[in-house]
């Protein structure tokens, strides 16, 4: 694309900017949202692979996202029953239509980003291309403009640095020059979010925001003559609330593939899925809440093991000069009685461990619903901070598999072949649909009332089982890895305190509006 030499005319490519005013606005992105309820799984991606390749690709994606948060399972990989032959694409006039860019804090150390770049050099990752960007340059590490892919027909991936601000997961759709404006209006309808950052060839929609990271959805206009190539093995899925109001406004025909899911295309031919935003059944949610109210021991914070970050000296130094441990991103919490044994069983010296919570802003209480929704419960955010500097490999877990027994009688259209499928041979299943068997599985995994009356300590094995079920239901219930299970009253007080913290942070960030960096 031809660009003017003037610095003011520099256009943001969308795939290489992070931090700066984007991050400052993201802390107050809920003010710009049409729908006040935040959902970290509002946008997700389905990847369809040839037989025998799904496990390898799913693990590669999970390892990558674990550097930001292990519970962010935004990608689901499934297999088609027969391998698909693909036609070669002329690369000099085409560009893959979808990319995922991870913006990581350089304050955690360059070793982290270098490690991820080394991961891209190993299978199943494949080098795709290097992007050339014009404009204002800042010092960056090698390979900062490289894009990689997992397989043909899957999205591009890239790692970028963030000098300040929060870490970002950004979904980017590359649009044709002619359709950029129309697609911006279409996705504004689907997301029910206003564009809060826009340039002539780039715009950003806020999807989810907390104190540590943002999830964004962006559109990038290609130059004249370039054509975005829709990915034949990947589909974007969006949670929507009102099918009846949305479907007549979309540019292309919508066809149902199941009771709660529809498929359609955007102006450039990208296949997208629309899922009815459903919460767990009232019975299941209230069962969980009533269980917590009957068992106060379950409401106490429990910290299990440290996560993946290395706190460096200086900005992120773990121990202050007076010998006391500093707590980052949240308030200090003491261990409840009975958890000392849990720490000892993990072989962690209790005197060297202090729990802290990175973020409180994941607690999002519903404002209009009369019963708790999926957004009322947090992704697990409690971690342990060590006084001594240690470097830990990111803790990640593979995505839970869907129990086919819970889908008895279900019929759905295969989004890959268009054929009707029964529950016995479903090859493409939404990982975020509520499962009928969740209530019984959850109740079976929880300890009995009598067991809790004798001890306030929750066994690690039982807690791990609960965490596994939690992750399969899009983190509806707090995850076990350092999660704090709270009653509704505790959550409400926690929410008010978080709102005051976020408000104070927004006022501080507004003072810095004159600073701006473009991350290339």
Swiss-Prot record:
Pfam families: FAM124
Positions with biased composition (Low complexity): 20-32
Region (Disordered): 1-34, 311-334
Assigned protein family: Belongs to the FAM124 family.
Name listed for the protein in its UniProt record: Protein FAM124A
Organism: Xenopus laevis
Gene: fam124a
């Amino acid at each position: 694309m031809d660009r003017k030499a003037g610095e003011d005319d520099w256009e943001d490519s969308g795939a290489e900017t992070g931090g700066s005013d984007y991050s400052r606005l993201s802390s107050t992105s809920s003010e710009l949202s049409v729908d006040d309820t935040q959902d970290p799984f509002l946008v997700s991606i389905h990847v369809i692979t040839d037989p025998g390749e799904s496990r390898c690709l799913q693990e590669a994606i999970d390892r990558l996202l674990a550097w930001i948060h292990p519970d962010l399972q935004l990608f689901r990989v499934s297999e088609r029953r027969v391998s698909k032959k693909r036609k070669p694409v002329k690369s000099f006039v085409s560009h893959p239509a979808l990319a995922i860019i991870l913006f990581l804090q350089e304050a955690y150390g360059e070793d982290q980003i270098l490690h991820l770049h080394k991961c891209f050099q190993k299978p199943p990752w494949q080098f795709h291309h290097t992007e050339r960007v014009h404009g204002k340059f800042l010092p960056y590490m090698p390979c900062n403009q490289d894009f990689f892919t997992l397989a043909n027909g899957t999205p591009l991936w890239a790692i970028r640095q963030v000098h300040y601000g929060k870490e970002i997961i950004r979904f980017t759709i590359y649009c044709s020059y002619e359709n950029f404006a129309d697609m911006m209006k279409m996705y504004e309808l689907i997301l029910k979010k206003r564009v809060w950052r826009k340039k002539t060839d780039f715009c950003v929609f806020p999807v989810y925001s907390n104190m540590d990271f943002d999830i964004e959805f962006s559109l990038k206009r290609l130059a004249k003559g370039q054509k975005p190539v829709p990915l034949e093995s990947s589909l974007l899925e969006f949670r929507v609330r009102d099918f009846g109001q949305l479907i007549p406004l979309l540019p292309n025909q919508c066809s149902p593939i199941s009771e709660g899911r529809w498929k359609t295309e955007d102006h450039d031919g990208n296949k997208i899925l629309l899922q009815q935003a459903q919460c767990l059944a009232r019975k299941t949610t209230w069962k969980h809440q009533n269980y917590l109210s009957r068992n106060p021991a379950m409401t106490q914070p429990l910290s299990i093991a440290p996560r993946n970050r290395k706190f460096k000296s200086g900005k992120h130094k773990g121990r202050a000069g007076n010998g006391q441990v500093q707590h980052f991103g949240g308030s200090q919490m003491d261990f409840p009685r009975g958890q000392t044994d849990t720490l000892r069983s993990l072989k962690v010296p209790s005197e060297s461990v202090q729990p802290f919570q990175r973020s409180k802003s994941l607690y999002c209480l519903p404002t209009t619903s009369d019963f708790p929704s999926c957004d009322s419960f947090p992704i697990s955010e409690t971690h342990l901070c060590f006084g001594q500097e240690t470097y830990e490999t990111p803790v990640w877990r593979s995505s839970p598999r869907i129990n086919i027994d819970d889908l008895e009688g279900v019929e759905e259209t295969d989004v890959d072949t268009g054929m009707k499928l029964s529950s016995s041979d479903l090859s493409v299943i939404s990982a975020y649909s509520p499962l009928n068997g969740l209530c019984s599985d959850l109740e079976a995994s929880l300890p009995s009332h009598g067991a809790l009356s004798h001890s306030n300590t929750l066994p690690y094995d039982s807690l791990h089982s609960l965490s596994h079920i939690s992750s399969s239901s899009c983190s509806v219930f707090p995850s076990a890895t350092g999660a704090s299970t709270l009653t509704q009253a505790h959550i409400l007080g926690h929410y008010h305190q978080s709102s005051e913290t976020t408000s104070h942070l927004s006022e501080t960030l507004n003072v810095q509006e004159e600073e701006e960096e473009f991350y290339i």
